[in-house]
Amino acid sequence: MHSETICADLTADYTDVTGYYSTHFPHPYPPYVREATAHFQRKGKHYLLTSGTTGYLPNPSEAAIADTWHGPYQVQENSHLSDESHTSYHSQISSVFKVHGKKDLYIAMADRWMPKHMHLQYERYRELFEKNFNPDYSGNVQMDEEILKCVLDKNTSIADYVWLPIRFEGENAYIDWLDEWRGEDYE
């Protein structure tokens, strides 16, 4: 099991690593270990949007900002402020792109792996992951049959996709839920 995110330099032809790398976001165990890193640059800053490790169950994304590809990265506060489920709107960000011809429009693309289980909130299963991976866990959480069914139900062929614009306040990146939006609404 990995415990940190690694940024590695690639060779000029992008077919190998150079041997130079940096490590970020160390965490001892799931669900806090970061994965599914989406990198983008904006106004000279490097951004990494990451997911926790809860299988196909969604969890809170983290946004981090640095001056260089190798950091150090500063994790910002919650980037999904209106998401009461703490599941990044029941999705996992996989990529971010800047829209050509727009002044400052970046779109976060995310996979919604478990669309049949959007009623579940992160706090309901966070502690189950901690119980299974934290060797010092001393809580008394009981296995939740519905969560177990979700973990075993890995039918990702029914996945949905979520595309949302990223809103910036200064350097911080925020993703707000919008039932609908149009590129024409942005400069």
What are these regions (language model features)?
Residues M1-E187:
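Carbohydrate-active catalytic/glycan-binding domains of CAZyme proteins
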